[in-house]
Amino acid sequence: MKFLGIAALVAGLLAPSLVLGAPAPGTEGVNLLTPVDKRQDSQAERYGGGGGGGCNSPTNRQCWSPGFNINTDYELGTPNTGKTRRYKLTLTETDNWIGPDGVIKDKVMMVNDKIIGPTIQADWGDYIEITVINKLKSNGTSIHWHGMHQRNSNIQDGVNGVTECPIPPRGGSKVYRWRATQYGTSWYHSHFSAQYGNGIVGPIVINGPASANYDVDLGPFPLTDYYYDTADRLVLLTQHAGPPPSNNVLFNGFAKHPTTGAGQYATVSLTKGKKHRLRLINTSVENHFQLSLVNHSMTIISADLVPVQPYKVDSLFLGVGQRYDVIIDANQAVGNYWFNVTFGGSKLCGDSDNHYPAAIFRYQGAPKALPTNQGVAPVDHQCLDLNDLKPVLQRSLNTNSIALNTGNTIPITLDGFVWRVNGTAININWNKPVLEYVLTGNTNYSQSDNIVQVEGVNQWKYWLIENDPDGAFSLPHPIHLHGHDFLILGRSPDVTAISQTRYVFDPAVDMARLNGNNPTRRDTAMLPAKGWLLIAFRTDNPGSWLMHCHIAWHVSGGLSNQFLERAQDLRNSISPADKKAFNDNCDAWRAYFPDNAPFPKDDSGLRSGVKAREVKMKW
């Protein structure tokens, strides 16, 4: 396998970006009616829901149930469904596994015997109870419910070393229980080192209203980079060199080998004249994707569980950890169409050995054949996501009242191949989670936990994140926050990712660039290379919440901090039953680690530069 050091990476950055979907050798005439077709036909019936009140329909997706619709403030009110959805996720590992593109991997980890686990589905307002059984041979685990706010349930966030001890291997188990206070599309994944890169991921669909009408819900469509080596080995390699390109890209678990033609293209069935909702999820460890469907536009209706006003695009940048719900109007001639992935930003935001990763969107009645039109190259998004989406549920701030507070600076920098936040690479303690400090009233937190204490009830907190302005080389980062959506008040000027033009936030110039009038709101946003990002969230959800880069190698290398929000309120919110479950799980883990574990902890303990500083309001 080829690995690039930083020097080699820089030398290759100006190579042309990958272009468009093209058939792998020897695939012409192959029967492309894959199991995805059947799965998604059933999804068209299962997903979407009816809201209990029967008002949600193809001609009125804005309605949900009596008293609840697209304009309801879901942070203040949630339907009382009286339902609990129960799931069981069993984690296992397999040796010498034949992958989707025919290449044998010496080890994979699975959820319910699949590298993409079952979809967790519920209606807005349901409780969800998930039993996780860890049958891995030597790894602990914890499962994080990405993007779910966990309002008043921080203890269910699923982050080992923060909200819990890991679940021990060889049969250890844990029951997570939380309420679906939001709706839309997300995913779950392991938060134990880089473990999710070995296959421990799965979609989440919370049925609810939508900002535009559609006929068919196609269900979740996860996309991920795919490596023939294990994530564990890749983490160790990235501690000494730049990351390798992915070996392939999976579309809903399917892929074609770029040279042998082994495997299958994922296929999605469209009905002529119908509008289809597709739930896009980037579950990668490193690759960001530019997506386009030949001869079709996409209308965005949701970004990271935040419903937005319909926004039409011809192509879409999907960063690691991000989700978009889009509507595709099947208004073209009956036929087969390439759904293409390309890599922009001079490959600063990902690369693959498969130069033409693609899936097939097939109209009902079309022949089972490869598409013939490769389409045209989409615009290069330069590793930047959309920042002009308008949320349906509005949040606005007066940006003129923002003042910098340099006393709350949180520098995040690259030191060799170690990422440091506030001068420290986060290194959580599996045996003593931060929540244990909170439960016992111990405020002597470890420096390596990178804790920023945040107080004040329902106050807006502002954070300016600057991307390694003093370093010689900088990369874009998908910044993800647990427990909250954040308002994107501004970012540095759009430039090419390769330019490495330095942009340090200058209040005299950049205050005018800020937008507080219902700006884009989400839980994962791109921090430009050598640039800045200014975000805000409200202190309405007590918890210890990670903010981290969602590139697995970077968070594994330390790029993360914790916002400990309203610690005393957090302590008071935890029930005796949850506290007992927490202690029982930690006792089980400590009986295993480190004395009975065959391997030491060799990274931050999470999935495994930049400055962040708090900005306060003037009074």
Curated annotation (Swiss-Prot):
GO molecular function: copper ion binding; hydroquinone:oxygen oxidoreductase activity; oxidoreductase activity
Variant or mutagenesis effect after changing D351T: In strain: TS
EC number: 1.10.3.2
Effect of L439M: In strain: TS
Residues of the propeptide: 22-49, 607-619
Effect of H355K: In strain: TS
Primary enzyme class: oxidoreductase
Residues noted as binding Cu cation 1 in the record, renumbered to the chain: H144, H480
Binding site residues for Cu cation 2: H146, H189, H550
Reactions performed catalytically: 4 hydroquinone + O2 = 4 benzosemiquinone + 2 H2O
Keyword Disulfide bond part of the UniProt annotation: yes
Effect on the protein of changing I98L: In strain: TS
Effect of V320I: In strain: TS
Primary role: Lignin degradation and detoxification of lignin-derived products.
Entry similarity comment: Belongs to the multicopper oxidase family.
Record-given protein name: Laccase
Annotated organism of origin: Neurospora crassa (strain ATCC 24698 / 74-OR23-1A / CBS 708.71 / DSM 1257 / FGSC 987)
Gene symbol of the encoding locus: lacc
